[in-house]
Amino acid sequence: HVEWAVKAADAGKHVLVEKPLALNAEDIARVIDARDRNRVLVSEAFMVTYHPQWLKVRELVREGAIGQLRHVQGVFTYYNVDANNMRNKLELGGGVLRDIGVYPTVTTRFVTGTEPTRLQAVVVRDPSFGTDIYASVRADCGSFEMSFYVATQMAVRQQMVFHGDKGFIELETPFNSRVYGDGRVILHNAGHAESTVFRFGDTRQYRLQAEAFARAVAGERVEVFSLEDSMKNQQVIDAIYRAAGHDTWESVRSS
């Protein structure tokens, strides 16, 4: 969506742009330049960062509710073999990593404020579509490790777990709350004998995203997903594609 995001910014329009914003991190620099030249607000639509369940997870981790974070684990899968679906069209930027692989990375970064430094990955492509349909990733985040797998030709499942030395946090519908069930954050203690459940019923994360963006445009001090954040997240995705070509660690090139 880089071309039209730049055109809209050059026309003086504020832009809430659907993800994936770009096919590689370098292209996002063009959007940042257009934003700055035209003094407009441009934000990639990562709706999950506006959902209160993710604000709660960030709060719990930062206040030490699970002690020292050691590992983040994620999974996001669905089944789609429709050749006419844009997610299965290579020329339209289809593929599992650009469609849903961005979510385990962006939410881990959102919660921890930490960037992966290096990673290993396995990526499988569909022989007919040419798009990536499965990816398994292991990333070094310094004081903790992140691992996840995503797929477009597996039964529907999604989950995120933040595991510390004093407990762990589980999200049952981390990305599509209301579609596969209401948002719930479950905090387990170290012995897995007690748990606290935080419920987020009829929460409409897309509406919260649109409202936050509108308030920011109106001049209010509201946290919206920045293009700099988009750049960092895309750098992780770019590194995953590179890592798929060999068996060793691949550095995440941060700007």
Predicted features, each with a name:
Residues 1, 5, 28, 54, ...:
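A general structural signal for well-ordered alpha-helical segments in protein cores
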Residues 2-49, 64:
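Beta-strand-loop-alpha-helix segment that lines the small-molecule cofactor/substrate pocket
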Residues 105-179, 200, 207-221:
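Contiguous beta-strand/loop segments that form the cofactor/metal-binding neighborhood of enzyme cores
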Residues 32-41, 55-70, 164, 168:
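Basic phosphate/pyrophosphate-binding loop/patch that engages nucleotide-derived ligands
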Residues 48-128, 247:
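Predominantly a Rossmann-like dinucleotide-binding segment in NAD(P)-dependent oxidoreductases
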Residues 12, 84-92, 188-195:
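Short glycine/proline- and charge-enriched loop/turn segments
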Residues 214-255:
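C-terminal helix-rich "cap/oligomerization" subdomain common to oxidoreductases
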Residues 92-98, 195-204:
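A short glycine-threonine-serine/GTX helix/turn-capping micro-motif
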